[in-house]
Amino acid sequence: MNPVPAQREYFLDSIRAWLMLLGIPFHISLIYSSHTWHVNSAESSLWLTLFNDFIHSFRMQVFFVISGYFSYMLFLRYPLKKWWKVRVERVGIPMLTAIPLLTLPQFIMLQYVKGKAESWPGLSLYDKYNTLAWELISHLWFLLVLVVMTTLCVWIFKRIRNNLENSDKTNKKFSMVKLSVIFLCLGIGYAVIRRTIFIVYPPILSNGMFNFIVMQTLFYLPFFILGALAFIFPHLKALFTTPSRGCTLAAALAFVAYLLNQRYGSGDAWMYETESVITMVLGLWMVNVVFSFGHRLLNFQSARVTYFVNASLFIYLVHHPLTLFFGAYITPHITSNWLGFLCGLIFVVGIAIILYEIHLRIPLLKFLFSGKPVVKRENDKAPAR
């Protein structure tokens, strides 16, 4: 069993928090992009569309690598059953809390904003179920995927640990070229699976729960496992934290290919399959870009950084309904897209931080939005000496 390093990986904590918080400008820019969303501005902005595409092309791939890294670290710290329980509680409880408190009111608001409240009774039972699946899971999808991945990794991590006990991990060598070939093959494999499903039974791809539990898990699981391997093998971690011009250039070219596919691809043709191949390798290369950047600039302890690391999940959970409220009721009154984008950031971040501070003072909400039981310090009750 590998010892858990005593030194905290501050840069990984910071990167994970910033990737979470990037969801705020991502969703606000989505309002002003050329992409169709729940709410959109009257005129789209080319630069905000480009900004939105850039964030979307790599953010979650890097996020799941970091999640896999910390998951395996905890896997070595706890017994198997306790590890699964702790991990599922920390992501499952906030997800289940956010559904009635955040995404259900968000869904009701959108029904009236989009004028669909009157047509709801006429929907079939399946359409109601599927609509609720999409709308209630909403931006919480990654928490559901983490629950599924954690359950799958009960077996996967055990196999990895057993294989390590029977082999010499110091002889394991990694190169970005080999990893790129592997992830290219994984992207092609995912594309083949998706195309096969599209040919055999296309309606299942529109099923919300199938999309989240099967397709999203299938795509992001390699990144999750890559994160675990980066924890196990120092050489692999060093490969990601060492700046690489090759990875930076390859990521830039892959992003151009991603944009071209977005602009000229067709959903009825091969756009989604092509995107999966591009974003699979782009995500790998961006792990190097983000990790090396973060390792150089964010590998330090700071009270301010720690605050946002702790607040990032709560802020992400509440930002989505706030963003949609802003888009539905405030965006129409702001003629400038860039001014609207900046106002949206101030509006959403400001209210989210206020709500975060309020919830910290309510023990039940603090538990529900973190999944961590509130521990009372015995020292607080001890008499002064």
Curated annotation (Swiss-Prot):
It is a multi-pass membrane protein. Keywords: Acyltransferase, Cell membrane, Membrane, Transferase, Transmembrane, Transmembrane helix. It is found in: Cell membrane. This is Glucans biosynthesis protein C. The lineage of its organism: Bacteria, Pseudomonadati, Pseudomonadota, Gammaproteobacteria, Enterobacterales. Its EC number is 2.1.-.-. HAMAP family: MdoC_OpgC (MF_01066). It comes from the Bacteria. Pathway: Glycan metabolism; osmoregulated periplasmic glucan (OPG) biosynthesis. InterPro entries: Acyl_transf_3_dom, Glucan_succinyl_AcylTrfase, Glucans_biosynth_C. The chain crosses the membrane at residues 17-37, 60-80, 91-111, 137-157, 173-193, 213-233, 239-259, 274-294, 311-331, 338-358. GO terms for biological process: osmoregulated periplasmic glucan biosynthetic process. Belongs to the acyltransferase 3 family. OpgC subfamily. Necessary for the succinyl substitution of periplasmic glucans. Could catalyze the transfer of succinyl residues from the cytoplasmic side of the membrane to the nascent glucan backbones on the periplasmic side of the membrane. The gene is mdoC. Coiled coil: none annotated. GO terms for molecular function: succinyltransferase activity; transferase activity, transferring one-carbon groups. GO terms for cellular component: plasma membrane.
